[in-house]
Each structure stands twice: as C-alpha cells, then as structure tokens.
Amino acid sequence: MLNRVAVLSDIHGVLPALEAVLAEPDVAAADLIVLTGDIAAGPQPVQVLDLLAGLGDRVCWVRGNADRELVEARAGRPSPIEVSNWAAGQLRDDQLERLATLPLTVTLEIDGLGPVLFCHATPRDDEEVVLVDTRMARWTEVFADLPAGVRTVVCGHTHMPFTRLVDRRLVVNPGSIGMPYGGPGAHWALLGPGVQLRRTDFDVDAACARVAAESTFPDAAGFADEYLRSRHSDADALAVFAPRDGR
C-alpha cells in the first residue's frame, strides 16, 4: 500500500511548470507520482517526456486524449490542434512507443483511501467531459461499471481542480500543471491519507520567456502567454465544456 501519492495532470509539454512541481518537497518525498494524461502535447514535448522517464519507477503513467492524438498524428491522422501536430513531429520513436502503450486507467491502493482509480477524463473514455457541477444521473452513468470497492476516482482533462462526492464516491480533479484555467500556477494533488489540492507558484514571466526561447514551436511565445498566464477563466472553460457534459 502506498502512503503518499502526488498526482500531476495535463502537463501539456510545459517544462518550467513541471520542474517547479517536481521540486516541491511533498512531491519529492511521495512514494509515487501518477500522471493522469495529456503529458506532452505542448511546446516542450521531448524535454518533458525525458525528464519524467528519467524518474523511472517513481512515475506511473495514464493515457490522456492528447497523448493518443500525438500517436495518431504521427501515423497520418492530424489533430485539429496545431501544437499537437507539431509536437508529434518532434517526438522520438521510443517516446511515441511509450505513449502508444499507456493504459486508460490504473488502480492503486493508497493509505486512508483504499483502491483509487486514476484516469484522464472518465474511467471509460479519455475525452469524455465531467465537471464539478455535472448532474448526479450522469455521474451514475459514467461510473456504472466501476467495482464497488473503488470509492475514490481521480481524473483530469478539464484543467480545473475540484473535489466532490458522487453517491459516496470521492471524485478528485487535480487541475492542470501546464494549462491551468482560472488562475496561474501549476495545480496538482497529494493523496494519502486524505486529499489535498495544491498549487505551485513559479515565476511566470521567466517561464514564458524560457518557453519562447527554448521551443521551436512557431507560436511558442503565444502559447506560453495564453496558458501559463491563464488567460482563460474557469467560467470561460465551463461555458465551453458544458455542451459536452450533455447540457
């Protein structure tokens, strides 16, 4: 059983934000780091994957839709997102192979929480949308096939941190490391024996300048300005995601 698990989601290829979180004492001391998807689709994909791969067995990887789309883009099925197509072209074959073999879900035993299921969007789909205010009937549908013993589900995908109870199950979204909605900073979670939503502050100006200088993505500066500065509010994001939540 694991005592402490750090959950990092939606890094989106932003190296300075990832480095800031990995430098957190509680992340460094965690028994395991779980990545809940959308790891590399961004301006520094190779560097992010190399840094995480270098941590070896301390990292548990889960597939996100953007990870799948990188593999698809490299295979000739382009993404509608420009940075994803660019990132797919940067990755080495070994990195693509890693992304291609990531699981949709992982279940781990954590002190105080029991079996915890980790996924990117939902346990059954890597791009399905659920939100903090999703209707109970929809949550019931989404969780219909979960084992009864799984009382905690950790997801990502929407880049907005929350915790809520869903018919006696705890749902945790750690938010996003590299593309936060609602405010700057790198958002993550610490599990065991309870649940803590965390935010790591870092020098956003310096991070934006570094991404612009080090990435060869043509609009690296624009990407960094838009996402590291969190130009999109949580209200903006909820308005975009709501129709995909069946509303």
Features from the language model and the residues they span:
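Beta-strand-turn-beta hairpins that frame and shape the catalytic cleft
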Residues: 1-6, 107-117, 166-170
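Core catalytic region of metal-dependent phosphoesterases/phosphodiesterases
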Residues: 3-100
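Conserved beta-strand scaffold positions in the cores of enzyme catalytic domains, especially
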Residues: 7, 61, 153, 171-173, ...
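Active-site environment of divalent metal-dependent phosphoester hydrolases
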Residues: 12-17, 41-43, 66-71, 126, ...
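Glycine-rich phosphate-binding loop signature in dinucleotide/nucleotide-binding domains
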Residues: 25-29, 55, 110-112, 146-149, ...
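Active-site-proximal segments of metal-dependent phosphoesterases and phosphodiesterases across multiple
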Residues: 77-82, 112, 116-148
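Anionic-ligand binding region
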Residues: 133-172, 186-188
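Acidic, His/Gly-rich catalytic cores of divalent-metal-dependent hydrolytic chemistry
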Residues: 165-247
